A protein has these predicted regions:
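Repeated scaffold domains used in trafficking and secretory/extracellular systems
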Residues: 26-32, 64-74, 102-112, 149-160, ...
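A short beta-strand motif characteristic of beta-propeller blades
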Residues: 16-23, 56-61, 94-99, 141-147, ...
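WD40 beta-propeller blade core
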Residues: 48, 86-87, 135, 173-175, ...
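Loop/turn-rich, solvent-exposed surfaces of beta-rich toroidal or solenoidal domains
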Residues: 260-295
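Hydrophobic beta-strand positions that form the internal "hydrophobic ladder"
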Residues: 38, 77, 115, 163, ...
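A short helix->beta-strand "capping" segment at the edge of beta-propeller domains
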Residues: 2-26, 53-56
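Short, solvent-exposed loop/turn segments at conserved positions within beta-propeller repeat blades
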Residues: 79-80, 124-131, 168-170, 285-290
């Protein structure tokens, strides 16, 4: 069943529901939460860290840029930047190590024993990525293994100590990398992979350029077609949710395989906190102005719509918190308890007054003083 979203509700702003707003210099490239710390990096090369409870800036560093992707564990932030991958101590912002790669650094994922990183080379003659590499780096910063890939990896997941990569042209399909080499596997769906993630139960999910989704469990794959445009964004938990270039948001079979149609291409989609005990799904789209939507994951019913003046380009969520980074460099944090409390006070039929909005801005500023 296809539903329309965002056509009947009076809309509050993202700022109205944000318990913390901070800035990173330039367009946001990534945002993450690690424990009680909020970290973000920008296309211009800035990386900063704030304490979530107080809002205080803990540290800020500047790199050449652009930053592109990040992952973390309890001690370190790992992020790709230009042709390098960095390991930064979360507690201090000090750099533990930096490894220079070949080509542009792309994706990074942390495993129990190493850090997997992908890089690629763009061929201007064919207007596509012709070469790629995958790197296995230990926690001391030593490169343990490197392998060349046919084309660029558009998704990267850690699975049982190996790297799982979703590939675009010319190979398509996916690859499994380990120190013994790279194994290429074909899928029933032959179109390029545009997104991918790992399910909590260990399965791997890939989104394709034609709107199909392939789910792999125990070496057995199944494919479903959701539309005729590319999968643009994807998130995984116990099930999966995807956003299409056409504006469709859809879920996996265990969540009912429902669909919602937004007004424009989906920029980000993520599981996150909700207004009730059922997990929420958040997604954003853009059409001269931004729309951020919260829906019930079980049936796809719209719970909340927020406006934002700048395009959302990055997102990260935990059970209790969701963070959005926009193209202007602003980071907005929504916490579950604050979300529920303000929803009760800010009904969709009553937009917050200018005076109340300014007061909230002052409170957020004091939180970081």
């Amino acid at each position: 069943m296809l539903r329309k979203a965002g056509v009947h509700m009076t809309v509050s702003s993202l700022t109205d529901y944000s318990s913390l707003v901070r800035e990173i210099g330039g367009e946001c490239a990534f945002v993450r939460v690690s424990g009680e710390l909020l970290v973000s990096g920008s296309k211009s090369g800035e990386v900063a860290c704030w304490d979530l409870s107080s809002g205080k800036e803990m540290w800020r560093s500047r790199f050449e840029g652009p930053c592109s992707n990040a992952d973390s564990n309890k001690d370190f932030l790992f992020f790709t930047e230009s042709d390098r991958v960095h390991a930064i101590m979360l507690s201090s912002g000090d750099e533990a190590w930096c490894v220079e790669l070949e080509g542009s650094s792309d994706l990074v994922r942390v495993s129990s024993e190493c850090v997997w990183v992908t890089s690629s080379v763009y061929n201007f003659e064919i207007q596509d990525y012709s070469e790629g590499s995958v790197w296995k780096i230990d926690y001391s910063g030593k490169v343990r293994w490197r392998g060349d890939t046919i084309g660029r990896a558009w998704s990267l997941s850690d699975f049982q100590g190996k790297a799982i990569m979703g590939l675009s042209r010319p190979k398509c399909g996916y690859a499994i990398a380990s120190e013994t080499g790279i194994e290429y596997l074909e899928l029933e769906e032959k179109k390029p992979i545009t997104a991918g993630c790992k399910l909590d139960g260990g399965g791997i999910v890939f989104g394709h350029s034609n709107g199909s989704v392939t789910e792999i469990y125990g070496g057995v794959s199944s494919t479903v077609s959701l539309g005729d445009s590319a999968i643009r964004s994807m998130d995984c938990g116990s099930s999966w949710v995807v956003g299409l270039d056409s504006g469709v948001v859809s879920t996996g079979k265990s969540l009912g395989s429902w669909k919602i149609e937004s007004f424009e291409s989906i920029d980000v989609v993520s599981f996150g906190p909700s207004l009730d005990d059922v997990a929420g799904i958040w997604y954003s789209s853009w059409n001269d102005k931004g729309g951020i939507f919260l829906v019930d994951s079980s049936i796809g019913s719209l719970q909340l719509e927020l406006s934002h003046e700048s395009r959302i380009v990055a997102c990260f969520a935990t059970e209790h918190t969701i963070c959005f980074g926009d193209i202007s460099g602003c980071i907005h944090v929504i916490e579950k308890e604050v979300l529920r409390r303000r929803f009760g006070r800010l009904p969709e039929t009553d937009i917050e007054s200018g005076r109340e909005s300014e007061l909230r801005k002052k409170i957020r500023a004091l939180r970081g003083a």
